[in-house]
Amino acid sequence: MMDGGKGFEDALTGEQKIRNFNINFGPQHPAAHGVLRMVLELDGEIVERCDPHIGLLHRGTEKLMESRTYLQNLPYFDRLDYVAPMNQEHAWCLAIEKLTGVEVPRRASLIRVLYSEIGRILNHLLNVTTQAMDVGALTPPLWGFEEREKLMVFYERACGARLHAAYFRPGGVHQDLPDALLDDIEAWSHTFPNVLDDIDGLLTENRIFKQRNCDIGVVSEEEILQYGFSGVMVRGSGLAWDLRRAQPYECYDEFEFQVPVGKNGDCYDRYLCRMEEMRQSISIIRQAIAKLRDCPGDVLARGKLTPPKRGDMKTSMESLIHHFKLYTEGFHVPAGEVYAAVEAPKGEFGVYLVADGTNKPYRSKIRAPGYLHLQAMDHVARGHQLADVAAIIGTMDIVFGEIDR
């Protein structure tokens, strides 16, 4: 005998078995952060199984890259983690520069650091405030988006685009920054900590926020190593692993900054890490601006990878030919394999590039940090309440551009 309302009833003993029920979380759920569909198996209110279904935003980026030149591939990286686009371009440029042996001018290197840190703040502001909204705090996103708007304007003033920048180029950056922009970024860096303090005051000691985040989604050191986590997911559990410190790239070894780490590895510690990382990024931004003022010069390594100066093209035939070849055929990268990684806001964003000596990559594998974090969702969410799923996804910091790619 079966009655849907009661579950199964054993005819002999009269015992009832209650069936777990499955629900779909997403793909249009506001807390799903994009097009995530999760099939949750619930026993009452407890999550027994959590099955993420991905691929709803798959565009075949890695395959498309094999039929484009190296420069044409750069804009694909803006469309991966579209919350902080320049950090992704950085990894692609570093991979090409490693293979070609190009040395980036110091001024370009400083500009890259400056904009990578602006990207980090863009990302953490969005994450901290929307995660607060997922657990019921409605004010932080309104404050956070006001600051993000100012940062978007800095993006726009550097390269003309608010979102898909294509500003970092192999060999440097596309254009130099005007002095007025540096002044404005510096002025902003002195007012922003007050906004951080306001968000801090709203959330950090808030009883409801703490109850929703403390001891939720705890990740241990063993799990970090097994699942291949990176970024805040590692640092929230007390491991001070930051590529800017552990394997310095660009000119990060010249900067003074701390690597914030948590203690308990739960959602609350990850929130605290992100808040402190924004303060550290402000410190790096101020140092970068001070260094940029003392460091005039070119922002592109003039050579085979980058276009000649406009003035040269008007007088030199070779420069004109070089410009034409560069933008029709593209530059050639010597055959070889290389892995380049940057500490993106979400974790270690890496590019494994296989070049065959032509003007197009033979194969490139993109290591998106969010992909590995989402893989562990079943393991981390099991045994939690249904309402905690939103909190866990929020602190994993998931964006679907990079997961589905």
Curated annotation (Swiss-Prot):
Leading EC class = translocase
Q: Which domain of life is it from?
A: Bacteria
Principal location listed in the UniProt entry: membrane
Name the Pfam families on file: Complex1_49kDa
One term of GO molecular function: NADH:ubiquinone reductase (non-electrogenic) activity
Subcellular localization is given as: Cell inner membrane
Spell out the reaction equation it catalyses.
a quinone + NADH + 5 H(+)(in) = a quinol + NAD(+) + 4 H(+)(out)
Report the GO terms under cellular component. Answer: plasma membrane
- What's the Enzyme Commission number for this chain? 7.1.1.-
Q: How does it sit in the membrane?
A: Peripheral membrane protein
PROSITE patterns for this protein:
COMPLEX1_49K
Keywords per UniProt: Cell inner membrane, Cell membrane, Membrane, NAD, Quinone, Translocase, Transport, Ubiquinone
Per its database record, what is this protein's job?
NDH-1 shuttles electrons from NADH, via FMN and iron-sulfur (Fe-S) centers, to quinones in the respiratory chain. The immediate electron acceptor for the enzyme in this species is believed to be ubiquinone. Couples the redox reaction to proton translocation (for every two electrons transferred, four hydrogen ions are translocated across the cytoplasmic membrane), and thus conserves the redox energy in a proton gradient.
- Subunit note: NDH-1 is composed of 14 different subunits. Subunits NuoB, C, D, E, F, and G constitute the peripheral sector of the complex.
Q: Would you identify the family this protein belongs to, as annotated?
A: Belongs to the complex I 49 kDa subunit family.
Q: Report the PANTHER family cross-referenced here.
A: NADH DEHYDROGENASE [UBIQUINONE] IRON-SULFUR PROTEIN 2, MITOCHONDRIAL, NADH-UBIQUINONE OXIDOREDUCTASE 49 KDA SUBUNIT
Name the record gives this protein: NADH-quinone oxidoreductase subunit D
Q: Which organism is it from?
A: Ruegeria pomeroyi (strain ATCC 700808 / DSM 15171 / DSS-3) (Silicibacter pomeroyi)
